[in-house]
Amino acid sequence: HGSSFWSDAHSYEAMADDLAKVIAAHGGQADVVGHSMGGKAAMVLALAHGAAIRRLLVGDIAPVAYQHDQSPNIKAMKSLNLSAIRNRAEADAALAQSLADESLRAFLLQSLDFKTTPISWRINLEALEGSMPGIVGWPDISGQFEGPVLFLSGGASHYVQTESRLKIRTYFP
């Protein structure tokens, strides 16, 4: 995450178009695996550029809009004084002032680049924050992907609910 170019366009359609270009540059067809935001991007890729995908695996996400909002997490990340942080423990302590969930902090801190001076975020927080409604949403897209697809989710998943399965079958019969 975060090693690719940054763009202010952070929609699933833009991500799918980027993926299609990468796949075309590497031979024209790929087996695609996507989880969470990557899963939504992979689903849009399959629907908009189906010929680019040989097989699709989507982990713990459905082609639906969700009601949660990650903006408070982004706000907490942006609030860190990165020039004063020297290591992950200090970053965690600073982030703990805004976010109590230790596992969430550990996940978010994976996106800190400790090799830069000062430490920096590998991800474009401004683009994510500005695109949040689209990120938690689902684009107005039609069509179906007829290739092989596997959706994986745990029994206690908060992201693939029973009512989501009908929507999955609509796009991925």
Give the ranges of each region predicted by the language model.
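Active-site loop/oxyanion-hole signature of alpha/beta-hydrolase fold enzymes
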Residues: 1-33
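Active-site loop signature of alpha/beta-hydrolase-fold enzymes
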Residues: 1, 40, 64, 159
